[in-house]
Regions:
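A compositional/biophysical signature of low hydrophobicity enriched in polar/charged and small residues
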Residues: 1-166
Length: 166
């Protein structure tokens, strides 16, 4: 089982939250600082089940720094169907919405685009989370436009650009 968690942090606290996440033994390769709709995206792979996710990750993360709450909001995205695994750091993550009956079609079409590193279908506020590579912001703009024009049945896209962790 795989999952993602998005974290929206109190203003100015994302560096401290990142430090606390690393203290929980999360790999830096699975923690992404984003410029976009959320501050941090965390990827979890190889989970046995939902109970393991809740006890090992969800509860500890939501309780980071209980004396001074720094996380305003979390969202959990449970992976329904995994896309390709990736080790390359993405330039951005796209959060996509489609009609439920089109999940597989959208996932397949996305994974046929060379700049798409992975496309996972998920339960949550979005239907697909997509890691992409781009050379720069212009390249990303062209890629998002291509996806919106070539991938059928997309109802909306939200982009989070990956920032350097430290």
């Amino acid at each position: 089982m795989n999952a993602y968690m998005t974290l929206s942090c109190k203003v100015g606290s994302f560096n401290r939250v990142l430090d606390e996440l690393i203290k929980l033994n999360l790999s830096k390769k699975d923690v992404f600082l984003l410029f976009g709709p959320v501050d941090i995206l965390v990827r979890f792979s190889g989970l046995k089940d939902l109970d393991e996710f809740i006890s090992k990750w969800f509860n500890p993360i939501r309780n980071i720094t209980p004396d001074e709450p720094m996380i305003d909001k979390t969202q959990t995205l449970i992976v329904i169907s995994e896309g390709r695994s990736f080790t390359e750091e993405p330039y951005a993550f796209l959060f996509l919405n489609t009609q439920p009956r089109n999940l597989e079609l959208v996932q397949e079409a996305l994974q046929n685009i060379p700049q798409v590193l992975s496309a996972d279908t998920v339960f949550g506020p979005y239907d697909v989370i997509c890691a992409v590579r781009a050379k720069d912001i212009v390249d990303l703009q062209q890629l998002v436009s291509r996806i919106q024009n070539e991938v059928p049945n997309i109802q909306g896209t939200i982009t989070g650009i990956v920032a350097s962790l430290y």
